[in-house]
Amino acid sequence: MPPPPGPAAALGTALLLLLLASESSHTVLLRAREAAQFLRPRQRRAYQVFEEAKQGHLERECVEEVCSKEEAREVFENDPETEYFYPRYQECMRKYGRPEEKNPDFAKCVQNLPDQCTPNPCDKKGTHICQDLMGNFFCVCTDGWGGRLCDKDVNECVQKNGGCSQVCHNKPGSFQCACHSGFSLASDGQTCQDIDECTDSDTCGDARCKNLPGSYSCLCDEGYTYSSKEKTCQDVDECQQDRCEQTCVNSPGSYTCHCDGRGGLKLSPDMDTCEDILPCVPFSMAKSVKSLYLGRMFSGTPVIRLRFKRLQPTRLLAEFDFRTFDPEGVLFFAGGRSDSTWIVLGLRAGRLELQLRYNGVGRITSSGPTINHGMWQTISVEELERNLVIKVNKDAVMKIAVAGELFQLERGLYHLNLTVGGIPFKESELVQPINPRLDGCMRSWNWLNGEDSAIQETVKANTKMQCFSVTERGSFFPGNGFATYRLNYTRTSLDVGTETTWEVKVVARIRPATDTGVLLALVGDDDVVPISVALVDYHSTKKLKKQLVVLAVEDVALALMEIKVCDSQEHTVTVSLREGEATLEVDGTKGQSEVSTAQLQERLDTLKTHLQGSVHTYVGGLPEVSVISAPVTAFYRGCMTLEVNGKILDLDTASYKHSDITSHSCPPVEHATP
């Protein structure tokens, strides 16, 4: 039967139980690596009974008396522990004296030498537990530490970023996951979740907030840029970026380019550059060199002046072919001074009229068929001994008795003045006033048996004196001029006292040659354009190429309507403006409004103010106004007749008309030959 354990063994057992109790009260969970370290196979000492025996041998052999290395070998029974123990044993004797001196510190020093974990050689911060081995020890490291003494920090971020979804920060013995700006760390401590900054209404202020992964963006409509300082969308001035080839106008969130319409330019498809306005419908513009156009001089002055001198008394004989759609005007004058003897052959209401004055006595006679039908007919005037005979197509339509001769004797010669397309004196000096302007054509003329050959040469040299070879009814605008009128659009109703009402109603029948041009416009004395009706080939706000008719007050489009402007057909454009109403129709189809009810009322109030002042009516174009004063400033090219407030506009009655505009005739569309 073995002997009972000694005091040292009992003390060791108690310490072991205390350690186990302590460990059990604080559960320690080791990672797999630590557990493997702790359970790692090693050369263990003998069972506890032998450990206790060894401690007793050590007490007897080396504490109570001095032991040699061989005696120590007998205690430990192995070289590693002996090699570890004996040098330190000698150190204990040097420090605390030999055994026989009975120094308690010496006994304690020797008794602790076999436990290589006392004092603990492992790093205190990084060690979970120190294992005593034969002449050695093993440090079991806590998470985040490594190395023999557990004093080396393990960089967990090296492998798979430490499990962090974004940022891994290594720390002594540990690590921490972090997130980029705009993300927050989830409850698992590893995953980063996007922060939706747009949930805060103040994030972008007036702008739209768009959440992005880890960020956000403040968005503005096109034409605006975001100011982070003021948190507002601010207008971009595109005109500072030289986007337009010619004139640029900035507007909130947008801009518009304008081209010199009067110079024959319009916007290109890119809506920034300019291009020429070119015809899309060909008109038959051929002229006849054998014809004489009577309507070239809008002033009413004659286009031809002849003076005949004869030695012998001579009678007038005139014959010519004539064609017109014009109901009124002067064909020719023959005679002397206004207060002497003369005749004027003209048209009134489409029929021939002869005004004559002999010896201060004036008469008027009119007879014959209506001849302003646009077809050629031969007209002749023959002075007989006591009569004037006028024939149409060889048929006498007038025979007038006269007392005197048209050729007047002066200084020994017989004189006769002859003017074509006008009179040589004021209209007021006629027997009855007549509008002398005549859009008519003459050919095969014969004045006094062909003694006027110089006229033919003059006409050949000047195309403006020549007529279109073929014409139709209407007015032709060549694209380089306009006509003006002084019209009144307001009236005071007697039924309602002094209240002034106003109305602008326009009916335009057009056959355009180009897709851009002003049909009609009102212009104030300050060059403001209160109203304009025009053809345009783009939608200004949508910046889209499209053939349209636009109705505008100043530079604001009230209504738009599509039109097939290049189809060679006649179209009817109807415009009506009055209190609370603005309509545009093309061929009976109503156009689309471009303004709100409030904006319309504001524009109509502005128009009313202009109409109560001085306005001029322009047809076919605009004067030299700013290119931004109206949506279109280009001249109209094509055929057109106009009716304003129920009255047909006769271009012969205009205040001014460009000489290239033909008042009552228009060349036909030139159809391609198969």
From Swiss-Prot:
It comes from Mus musculus (Mouse). The lineage of its organism: Eukaryota, Metazoa, Chordata, Craniata, Vertebrata. CDD domains: EGF_CA, LamG. Ligand for tyrosine-protein kinase receptors AXL, TYRO3 and MER whose signaling is implicated in cell growth and survival, cell adhesion and cell migration. GAS6/AXL signaling plays a role in various processes such as endothelial cell survival during acidification by preventing apoptosis, optimal cytokine signaling during human natural killer cell development, hepatic regeneration, gonadotropin-releasing hormone neuron survival and migration, platelet activation, or regulation of thrombotic responses. Residues 295-467, 474-666 form the Laminin G-like domain. One of its GO terms (cellular component) is extracellular space. This is Growth arrest-specific protein 6. Its main location: secreted. Heterodimer and heterotetramer with AXL. Gamma-carboxyglutamate residues are formed by vitamin K dependent carboxylation. These residues are essential for the binding of calcium. Residues 50-91 form the Gla domain. Gene3D superfamilies: 2.60.120.200, Coagulation Factor IX (4.10.740.10), Laminin (2.10.25.10). Pfam families: cEGF (PF12662), Gla (PF00594), Laminin_G_1 (PF00054), Laminin_G_2 (PF02210). Ca(2+) binds at D326, E328, R437, D652. The modification Phosphotyrosine is found at Y636. The modification Phosphothreonine is found at T609, T617, T633.
